[in-house]
Amino acid sequence: MLRQIADGVLIHESGFCQSNTVVVQGTAGVLLIDPGVHGSEMACLAHDLSDSGQTVVAGFSTHPHWDHLLWHAGLGEAPRYGTARCAATARDRLSGGVDAVAKAAGIPEQVPLDLLGLITGLPAETARIPWDGPEVRILEHQAHAPGHAALLIEERGLLVAGDMLSDVLIPMLDMNGTADPVEDYLAALRLLEDVAGDVEILVPGHGSIGGADQVRQRIDQDRAYVHALRDAHIPADRRLGPTAMPGWDWVGGVHARQLQLLAQRTERDGTPG
């Protein structure tokens, strides 16, 4: 079910990892950001949009992880965009076939994969999504995944953060696609911090919507976690351990794996990250 969170902006929340699809209303139709996740959920989204007389005129994937590269036939054949690096990474990862990706990533059977990753890369350094609607700024960085983009809709006071600034997920660093995953993540947080004063509503890729009072709080929380990870300290983070939200205890395993990978990189290269 669609829920309005700002003037001309709605979200659709999936039961899979509390994933958020963002719908932005434009002049002739809507921009769809990270639609997902199960087939029945995307069919419901398509039905809700159709019932309200809305046509999808553009799509955008914030980064090249499978749950952000989805689409459903009921959403139509609008152009689907991502940053140039995001699109190139998606093509490369899908070059061995969708079935191989599904097996490696453990994608649930309820997820339709026939339209997975069919996105067009925007020219490098494109500043805004090309569509007839509110101006959507692209804030590209290299935290979490190659070509990751946050989206800022200034006239709505809205920041779509992709897989950052979540109240349920810790920062997950890209340990394989970058020379310095720690600094890349910290640089991305600084980028988001630079626009925080313009944000009244924060939409993470997974988790709860945040208000203006939570934007800097979540930035600080993510930064503190990354610092603790870098220094191999135990993070005082409510997303881990007994304070984690019910059903999210598996995030502790993600943290343990990141500690291990970062320690291996430090041993190999001599520097954290």
Summary of predicted features, one role per range:
Residues 12-13, 119-120, 140-142:
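Short Gly/Pro-enriched turn/cap motifs at secondary-structure boundaries
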Residues 193-201, 208-273:
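Accessory terminal helices/loops
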Residues 1-47, 51, 150-162:
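Conserved beta-strand hairpin/beta-sheet module of binuclear metal-dependent hydrolase folds
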Residues 3-9, 107-112, 131-136:
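Short Pro/Gly-enriched beta-strand edge/turn motifs at strand-loop
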Residues 43, 47-128, 224-228:
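Active-site HxH/HxHxD metal-binding segment of metal-dependent hydrolases
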Residues 30-31, 37-38, 135-142, 146-218:
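Metallo-beta-lactamase
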Residues 28, 53-56, 77, 155, ...:
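A general structural motif
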